[in-house]
């Protein structure tokens, strides 16, 4: 049976027009737990009502059980944007955003010691006094045990009052308490947005950053996320859209997934297609191996999660589909062999 298959796992409908920002974790018994932002009230904007819904798969993602609610909407507007993290200790963490207003967006975390059967009450990771964007599938645990939650703080999400500032929130007690990094990262125009991080072999942390400057920018931390270098161009063109970076456990190479596109005449710097994967064997200095995941000119693809399950790579991302009434956002699941990324 092939490892390469895909399906729209959470199709959008008129009543549920947006299913986005998901993540997957492999449970100890081999089942897959998928969760995502479920916009349930017939509206699509980022501030529309949403809950965190979930499904389980017993067969590696080929089929999925009934949808259930993992996190009710406790926000003034919604809850959204899922990150799962399996700790070195074995416990499972579930992160999400609580959106209360255009000036109040916080990252929360719940813990499970029984592999997702029960969850603790939410703990706030950010400070409760700002608008913090944390993308799906973003939180990492370093080799030291420290947790790093990359976030961008927005003074005004409508573009006034300065651009976004990227930073990290850090925990040395498995998420029980959190503190902000000592330095932040600033860039022109809309700023340093939607950061993601990966630990490098030399112990530094690489942060990749969404920008309005035509390419992905990067910053480094040599002290476990406490301070960060000034951001610099990464040499990878990109529209105003997020990118995802991680390390393939079986090969040690870095994996980058993003929209390989840039059009300065377009309002968003270009459409969110194609969706491309690239490999780096030199810790992000170059990205010579590239393969196209999606390439439909009338669609968009973004907000990718990456989960490794043995020799398989499990992806989720949203698919933007235009309709006569406007558009919808479906959640897609895709399974690929690790070898696919190497052209095998």
State what each model feature region is.
Residues 1-344:
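Asp-box/BNR beta-propeller blade signature and adjacent active/binding-site loops
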């Amino acid at each position: 049976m092939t490892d390469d298959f895909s399906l729209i796992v959470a199709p959008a409908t008129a009543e549920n027009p947006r299913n986005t920002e998901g993540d997957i974790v492999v449970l100890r018994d081999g089942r897959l737990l998928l969760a995502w932002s479920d916009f349930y009230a017939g509206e699509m904007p980022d501030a529309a009502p949403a809950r965190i819904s979930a499904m389980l798969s017993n067969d590696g993602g080929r089929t999925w059980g009934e949808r259930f609610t993992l996190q009710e909407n406790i926000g003034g507007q919604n809850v959204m944007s899922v990150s799962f993290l399996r700790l070195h200790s074995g416990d499972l963490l579930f992160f999400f955003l609580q959106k209360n207003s255009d000036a109040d967006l916080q990252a929360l975390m719940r813990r499970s010691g029984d592999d997702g059967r029960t969850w603790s009450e939410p703990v706030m990771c950010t400070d409760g006094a700002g608008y913090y964007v944390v993308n799906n599938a973003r939180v990492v645990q370093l080799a030291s045990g420290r947790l790093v939650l990359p976030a961008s703080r927005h003074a005004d999400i409508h573009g006034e009052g300065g651009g976004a500032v990227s930073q990290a929130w850090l925990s040395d007690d498995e998420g029980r308490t959190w503190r902000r990094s000592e330095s932040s990262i600033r860039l022109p125009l809309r700023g340093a947005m939607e950061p993601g991080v990966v630990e490098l072999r030399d112990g530094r942390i690489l942060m990749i950053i969404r920008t309005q400057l035509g390419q992905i920018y990067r910053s480094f931390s040599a002290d476990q996320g406490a301070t960060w270098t000034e951001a610099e161009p990464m040499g990878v063109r990109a529209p105003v859209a997020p990118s995802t970076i991680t390390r393939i456990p079986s090969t040690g190479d870095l994996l980058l997934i993003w929209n390989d596109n840039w059009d300065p005449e377009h309002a968003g710097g270009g459409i969110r297609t194609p969706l491309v994967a690239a490999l780096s064997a030199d810790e992000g200095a170059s990205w010579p191996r590239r393969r196209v995941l999606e390439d439909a000119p009338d669609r968009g693809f973004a907000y990718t999660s990456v989960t490794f399950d043995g020799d398989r790579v499990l992806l989720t991302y949203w698919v933007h589909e235009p309709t006569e009434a406007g558009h919808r956002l479906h959640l897609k699941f895709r399974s690929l062999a690790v070898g696919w990324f190497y052209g095998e």
